[in-house]
Structures are given as structure tokens and as C-alpha cells.
Amino acid sequence: MARSPVEPPASQPAKRAAWLRAELERANYAYYVLDQPDLPDAEYDRLFVELQRIEAEHPDLVTPDSPTQRVGGEAASGFTPVVHDKPMLSLNNGFADEDVIAFDKRVADGLDKATDLAGTVTEPVEYACELKFDGLAISLRYENGRFVQASTRGDGTTGEDVTENIRTIRAIPLTLKGKRIPRMLDVRGEVLMFKRDFARLNERQRAAGQREFANPRNAAAGSLRQLDSKITASRPLSFFAYGIGVLDGADMPDTHSGLLDWYETLGLPVNRERAVVRGAAGLLAFFHSVGERRESLPYDIDGVVYKVNRRDEQDRLGFVSRAPRFALAHKFPAQEALTKLIAIDVQVGRTGAITPVARLEPVFVGGATVTNATLHNEDEVRRKDIRIGDTVIVRRAGDVIPEVVSAVLDRRPADAQEFVMPTECPECGSRIERLPDEAIARCTGGLFCPAQRKQALWHFAQRRALDIDGLGEKIIDQLVEQNLVRTPADLFNLGFSTLVALDRFAEKSARNLIDSLEKAKHTTLARFIYALGIRHVGESTAKDLAKHFGSLDPIMDAPIDALLEVNDVGPIVAESIHQFFAEEHNRTVIEQLRARGKVTWPEGPPAPRAPQGVLAGKTVVLTGTLPTLTREAAKEMLEAAGAKVAGSVSKKTDYVVAGADAGSKLAKAEELGIPVLDEAGMHTLLEGHAR
């Protein structure tokens, strides 16, 4: 069913109402029949409320098939239709506290509750409060305690027979227990999928190379409406009972809360997040209490439901065409909404990560007005095919950063533009590079880039780097925010008067920091390399670089092939080092540190190259405890024979030498089929007898 291409203006109520009916019906079909919802709940609700308003103002425009007159959806062709003995109606929605107060007032008026002169209800109504699950509504029919049929809500009057699929859900009893077993019981409830089960299902889908589900609701609906019940049986579905259709052969409980208590005695699963309250104040207290805990709940909910608790009062209030007067669904602020994507900029993180950010037309979602949303990385933009000018679905849940979920493709304008990742950092002009096998592109101006400045300074001052005692994060924040320090070289120009002027920085602290800076000028090459904050270069690699090259300039000028000769330096690390020193801004800061900052370290000749022995070009990994050799002695023997001794096992490893208590490295070698030697085998290898 195609989306209506032209949206008539509100000034033409007849055309507007017809368009709204068609659009809502199309959305209902996608939601209920195809299980492919393409309209966020908030947008559907907005269109529905608008249609209600037009029909209220123009009663002659109401049609029998209007979405306002029924629930929506129709039986899928693959399932047998089931006519409900009692309609499965939807609920009226409330979105603001005022809607709840108005609902309570209507109920009190309908029940002739006492009020004071100001119209305030003095005899509060008793309500049962429960959660509004984001799943699929189901009717379960039991005859003499035995489960005989299950059906979906469908259009509220006619649903789909899903009996065989429901039988596979372990939470649903096939036989009721207890003493008060009715001749016939029609249980209403919700099939859903818990968050943890949803995550595990998608893991299985990924492993099998199958399509992942967008959310738990889609997963539950798609699982339940399988023509092959074996597929449903493999899916982790759950169920909660919350209502009743027809009852025969037993007394109806006097209250809704009593009904749910009775269900528990019958062995039906009932959610415990419920309460009985009085008046609008009690309703709102329950709503806000649940809202505070919403993200920590093990399942998705999109609101709470209020029902007049007493059954006789429910009967007095009755129904309107599509919903009971005695109940209200109080929805949380929508977590998804539609808006237009105006532009895509890039943001530079503290570690240089380049993140595409969507600039949006303001939209209220998740309880806040959103104008920006993350697009994560370039690959995600391509995968989702998101373009500038698109109408997009934006999601914001709790404190999670807003994200663009998808583009609405049939609303894409002809002039929509594809995103192009910039080649230069917007903050400092340095090159943007993306290493092989990494999703994140990064600015290469680590020592120079303003966006990375605080992180670079903090790392530079670490104990394992230049060990500048007294230069903590709060001091760095002040120095950067007051533009006193732009690069690590500027640290060595700080004077006493500058430091004592900082907030909460006493004279003694200033003198101590100046002393620490003076001491930091005398360091080692390995510490200095580590202090530069080169991506993938830790302490161990910094030491290996210093030992291999002996001085800084050869490292700065080394081609990738030369870097690959360093112990434990692979292609990714070599590429990262090469890119760092290829960036002119970084080289400038290093020269400032050596000249203006006068940071020095002892330098020496490069390490002697290993002779071209029997193991030239081979990579060996040591693991466990050898009988007669220390790890260091074995390493020296192997390197003397031309081998590269690596710290981890990979497909490029030629041999693993294993001693006692060898652990995961040995297991990895066996998994990859790499030859494993003991100490005697290593000696044989060194003698040139093994190939």
C-alpha cells in the first residue's frame, strides 16, 4: 500500500480527512499485517488526533471505516480469521498530566462522585494501575481449564488464529490450575520479548547471517505470526495477562485488581508492576514512579494503563465506539519521531574520532527538543542510506544520545545529497585518516588539534609518560579554557604568576608544578614517544621503538617497511605511527618541545640488526615456563637466529614454543594449526634441522 504522495492543507477539511484516513490505514496495514511499521508512534498519534478533531468539527465527514471508529488492521491471508466473542478494543490515550486530571474528572462525573464548590472531587475514584507493554495483544480461550485457541486482536472484531504458535510459549499454561476453573475463559494479554532475550535472538540472527530485528516489539510480532510454528518455538517469547473477554461458569471478580490476583491462582503470568491508587494524584504518582525506572525494566513499555478498579463502576461508565470510558493509556513522551535532516556535520572527539552528526529541524522526542543526533560513523550512514534532505526517524530513549534510526525512503526529495566524509579536520585542518579494519575515521593532528587538546595534555603528563606531578585534569581544564596552553610545548613556558592566578591554585602548588615541569625536561626516549599519545603505541611498543631506532629522528622519518621490523609492530600499528609523524602539525609541536621546552633524553645507536640466521623472517611466540631457559634467554637465542619474537599468536605466527602451564596462546596455536615446540624442539629448530 503506497503512501499518499500529496498532503492536503488543513484549510480543506474533507480532503484533509480523506488523506488522514488513507495514511492511518496504510500505517495500520504496515504495523499489524506486514509487521513492518514505518510511522513512529508519535506521528501516528498526531495524525489520529488531528482526524478526531476534524471529524468532531465536521460530523458529516465521519465514515464507518474511519480509523477513529475501529482499532486497525485486518487478518493476514496466511491465518484463519477468528471473530472475537467480545471485541478487543484499544484505549484512549493521554500524554500530559492535564489529560490524566481531565480523565479522572470525567470518570468522577460519570459516577456522580461528590465534589466541593470548586469542582474538586472529594470522593476519589479507585483505580488499578499497570504497565503498557510494547508487544502484541492476544486473546487466549480456555474451556474447562484447557487451552483451546489463541487469536490476535486484528481489527478488534476479527483477529487471526495463532493457536499453534501460542502453544510454543512456555509462559502460557496449557491447563489452568486451582479450584475455581470456569467452563469458558477468554484471557486478554500481551505477547512480548524481554530485552535480554531480544539481544540473544539478534546474536543468533547475526551468526546465521540472517536479518536482525529492529526492536523487541517487531521481533515478538514477527515470531508470533510465523506460518511454521517451529520457528516460533525457537524464539524466546513471553506473556502477561491483563484483561478479560468472556467468562462463563465462574463469578467475575468484583475488581480489576482482584481479576489479576485470580489469574495468578490459575497459573497465568501476571506482571507485578501494578498498584491500586485513588484519584488523579495517585495516578500521576504511579506514572512518574514507573517513568523513573523505565530504562531499568527488563522489557519495553511505552506508558502505563489506568482502569477504574471496581467492576460495577466500569459497567456504569460503559464504552464509546472504540474504547472503554473507564480506562486510559498514559503514554510516555515518544521515543521516536519524524523530522527533516538539514545537514550532516562532523564532530571531533577527545581522542580524534570523527563522528558524523545530523543537524535536524527541531523535534520533541523522548521528553526533550532534539536538534542534533549522532550518525555513529561513515559506514552507518552508508548502511542506512541516510542523505541530507531526508525525512528521518529520530530516536531518543532516557539519557541516551539521540540517533537517526532510518530514512523514510518514499519521502526522499529528488535533490537529497549523499554524505561525503571530509578529508581535513574541521577543528585544526590536519588530515583525516581511517586505518584498515577500523570503522572510525580520526584526525591525525593529535598534539595540535583543539578538540583533542585536553586529552593530549593529560596523557602527556601521566606518570608513565613525562610524569608531571601536580598537573591534573582540573588544572588542565583551566589552562586550556583560558587559552594559556595550546600544545604540550606551552606547558614549559608557564610561569609562577600565571599558575597562582588559577582558581584554587596556591603558591606552594604553583612552585611544585614548576619543579615537576623542570624535572620532566629530562626523560627517556621511550617515555617521550609514549607521551606523544600515538594511537596503538603503548609503553611496550614505545620501548621497542626506542631500542630499535636509538633516536627520535629515524622513527619520525621511518617508512612503514622499516617500522614493521620493530618487535611486535604489525601493519595497523606501523600505519598509525607513520600517519602521526607524517602530519606536519605534530612535527612542529615536537620541534617546539625539543627547542623551546628543552626536553631532552639520552640517545644511542640503533639496535644491531639480527643476523640472517636459520629463522630469518620467522615469527615465534613463547608461552609457559621452559625447563632450563628463562623467557628472556630463549628470546635472545631466537632473535640471534633472526626470528621475530611476538607477544601474541596470529595467523602470521610460524612457531609457538610452549613450556609448563601454557595457557591461551597454546590453545590459539592449536586452533590455528601452528606448529608447537617444546624446549628441545626449539633447540632443534635453532640448529637448522626443522623447516
From Swiss-Prot:
Molecular function via GO: DNA binding; DNA ligase (NAD+) activity; metal ion binding
Residues reported to bind NAD(+): D41, A42, E43, Y44, D45, S90, L91, E130, R153, E190, K307, K331
EC number of the protein: 6.5.1.2
Binding site for Zn(2+): C425, C428, C443, C449
Record has Metal-binding as a keyword: yes
Keywords assigned by UniProt, alphabetized: DNA damage, DNA repair, DNA replication, Ligase, Magnesium, Manganese, Metal-binding, NAD, Zinc
UniProt family annotation: Belongs to the NAD-dependent DNA ligase family. LigA subfamily.
Protein name (database record): DNA ligase
Biological source species: Burkholderia pseudomallei (strain 1106a)
Gene: ligA
